[in-house]
């Protein structure tokens, strides 16, 4: 399934107008946005994936008016009416989903998260809910009716942890057919119900880091930096009459060591590391690559980013999987193309020494590869 995907947003609205008017602000329904033919999924194939212990899956079923969720892997998939089987990171499994995700190229790679596939029976869905991120809901097969409510950040804060079974008054309703796309911004309640069996919806999710997430990640980043000075407090103030009083010198020492660094170089480095952090659960197979073996390759080959690699550029620095890699000035154009296009042609035997050094490290870590990713579907 190597079909190239073209999301025809331009038929409805330009990417710049979409970002200005809709992204993060209001829902948008796009009819006949893509050609979905050739991407059909069968129940046997999807159920087989749900039995795989390396694939995250769950079933949401509505029985007697109540929602029940069970988590995979499943020895036997129990799937009846009003049920949905969800498979996460489907873009690593399904080539069509991967191409679909990559086609939304007006959103920076650093905000790409994953594609979740839902396979529903008639009446199935995940229940009314609201998300803290932007999502494109692509109808793959079958039909689904969507009810959309008004965007309400305050309501999102006060609902349950998973924000499911959210009660809201629909303000819009859409009937999604194969090839249709519904964009839903954060904090916007929505509820989709399948109108047929074997109904497939691809949920393309994007990262929307919260202020709390950024602060927590920044603290972890600072902890990982490990201040090599290893200063100890040893400057007591002498005050015999108020022994319960915390010494000013101790309070000052603590303030000094708990204040966030204001060095812009540190903050910029954190931004690059944070936004290139690979998806949770990403796995990279290390290899033993030698310089001699690399330089012996005297034919032009396609070098690719590992499908799980996150690579970003920030303030002229290159970050890959939360690592800042040194790139010589003469190699910058090479890495700009690799990071932006996710692949590049290279003849290793003709590569200069500085480029070879970085290539060997990245190949050894499994961050880049000469091999094309093998999709299961």
Name each region found by the language model.
Residues 1-27, 321-330, 364, 369-376:
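Fe(II)/2-oxoglutarate
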